[in-house]
Structures are given as C-alpha cells and as structure tokens.
C-alpha cells in the first residue's frame, strides 16, 4: 500500500523583530504582562515589500532542496494562510507556483486559520496515497501584520509573521501514520477577521478575538484530541519522540503537555521568539527542531493545532527527511 511521508521541512523567518519593549511604546501593555499571560517575548514582522507569497516561496525553495528535488518535480502546491496576498483571488498558492516558475500543476489555498498545516498534511497524504500526485509541496505562510490592528492591545501582542514548508512524497518506511481534523462553526464569532463596515470594497480588515473563551475551548479540545489520536493508533504518549504543537500561547501548550505527561525535552516551544504565526507556526517550530538536531529521520512526531472557525486537528508521523 502506498504511504505518504513528510520528506523535508524548512522555514523563512523575517528579519525585523518586534519585542515586548517595542509594544510597550505602542499600546498600554507591559513586557511582564505579555510574558506572564502568553509566554511571548518577541515576534517577527515582514517588510512592507514582502507579501505572504514571498515568505512562502522562500520557505518552499529550501524545502524542495532538502527533499532532494527540483521545483519542476512538484506536481501540487497547497497553502494554508489567513493573510493571503489578495482578498479573494488569485490564491497565494498560485502566486507561489508562479514564483517557482511552475505552470499546469494543482495549486490552491486552504482556509483553516491556525490549524491550517494539519489540514495540509491530511490533503497531501490523500493526494499522494491515492496516486494522484507524487510530490506535494505544503506551505503555511502568514503576514498577520497586514491584518493587525496595532491599537488593539488584546491581539496585536500575540501574532507574528513567517512561513514554513515541507514536501510530502512516497515512503513506506517513515510515513504519516494518521491525521485527524475537525471543526465547529458555532464558535466562529470568537475568533475572526472582520471586514470593515465602512467600505464594500473590503479594503480594511482586522483580526478580532475573545481571548478568554478561545483559551478555555482550545485547552479542552486539544487535550482530548491528542489523547484520542494516540489511543486510536495504540501509541503511548511516552513513545513520542517530539511533541510539536501550534505555538499560540505558552499556557495552552503547557496544559496539553501536562495532559500527556511529557518532559520538556520532548516538547518543542518557539512561541517566545516568534509569537503566534498561525498556519506557519507548526512547520516553523519543526524547522527549528530540525536545524537544532532535535528532529531526526524516523522520529515519531505528534502535532496538534487549534484555530479560528473553530478548526482543530492532530497528526502522528514518522519524519521522513534526512538529518540536518
């Protein structure tokens, strides 16, 4: 039976750093409060002339190279983002395909907010294992600064920019074991990007969140989801080599880590230096672990994410990339 594998991981991190000290000068907040409530110390911000597709392209090129492929070997591009270059069309995936010089291939975006990378894995796995595609490029890319209200202290402290990418291809040895995704649209108004009511041209967008409600639901949902996917696959939490969660809030991460009774050595945390990069956070965290030598070929990895929609998901996989 055909098995899909994540054969590479890479990221692109913008140069500009927006620290908590910087935010103290912009809104009524403090470094102490941000750190205590979120665990975030700084986040990266893309330059004005960098679009989401630019961030994604830079991560994609590294991911393709690390998979020992060339751009022309890719036959599908899937992008997860909540901050696309264009409001409706063309898709960010099509822009990245153009940047890579690729035509006549499948390219589309997935809108699943912070859960986007889990959704990408599920779709790429299905495409490869069905035999429809051979090498699927998956990209989580975000320029959240483009939809951020930097006068709203409740949300501007949380988010940053960046991109992560990987290639999913066949590998019957180190493959994606299972992916679970789900949603509940009844909570959609707790975390959303609101269109300005002053214009029907959709020129003004801003992210809005009811943080306390989101926090409670996220902790309960993620804790249950990771327990269920482990049980379904007859895997004990202690068998996991690395737990790489969506990097939204340190308190959420720690709550799920405690539920699984995992040591700090098995939990990858990058929220302190990148903030919440939405669909890019998991591949960015994976890449940090990869380049640090913590993520190695054959390692058993548990991923989880929760985002607007609400959407959520988890994945179990054995990493198929060569060691860094």
UniProtKB/Swiss-Prot annotation:
UniProt cross-references to InterPro entries, sorted A to Z: ACP_syn_III_C (IPR013747), ACP_syn_III_N (IPR013751), FabH (IPR004655), Thiolase-like (IPR016039)
The pathway it acts in is: Lipid metabolism; fatty acid biosynthesis
From the Swiss-Prot or TrEMBL record, state where the protein is found: Cytoplasm
A GO molecular-function descriptor: beta-ketoacyl-acyl-carrier-protein synthase III activity
Reaction catalysed by this chain? malonyl-[ACP] + acetyl-CoA + H(+) = 3-oxobutanoyl-[ACP] + CO2 + CoA
Can you list the GO cellular component terms from the UniProt entry?
cytoplasm
Keyword tags = Acyltransferase, Cytoplasm, Fatty acid biosynthesis, Fatty acid metabolism, Lipid biosynthesis, Lipid metabolism, Multifunctional enzyme, Transferase
User: Does the record bear Lipid metabolism in its keywords?
Assistant: yes
User: What GO biological process terms are annotated to this protein in UniProt?
Assistant: fatty acid biosynthetic process; secondary metabolite biosynthetic process
Annotated CDD domains: KAS_III
Q: Where is this region: ACP-binding?
A: 247-251
User: Where are the catalytic residues?
Assistant: 114, 246, 276
Name the enzyme group at the top EC level.
Answer: transferase
Q: What is its EC number?
A: 2.3.1.180
By sequence similarity, the record places it as follows: Belongs to the thiolase-like superfamily. FabH family.
Q: What does this protein do?
A: Catalyzes the condensation reaction of fatty acid synthesis by the addition to an acyl acceptor of two carbons from malonyl-ACP. Catalyzes the first condensation reaction which initiates fatty acid synthesis and may therefore play a role in governing the total rate of fatty acid production. Possesses both acetoacetyl-ACP synthase and acetyl transacylase activities. Its substrate specificity determines the biosynthesis of branched-chain and/or straight-chain of fatty acids.
**Domain remark text:** The last Arg residue of the ACP-binding site is essential for the weak association between ACP/AcpP and FabH.
Q: How does it assemble?
A: Homodimer.
Q: Which NCBIfam families match?
A: fabH, PRK09352.1
Task: Name the chain's protein.
Answer: Beta-ketoacyl-[acyl-carrier-protein] synthase III
Q: Please give the organism.
A: Campylobacter jejuni subsp. jejuni serotype O:6 (strain 81116 / NCTC 11828)
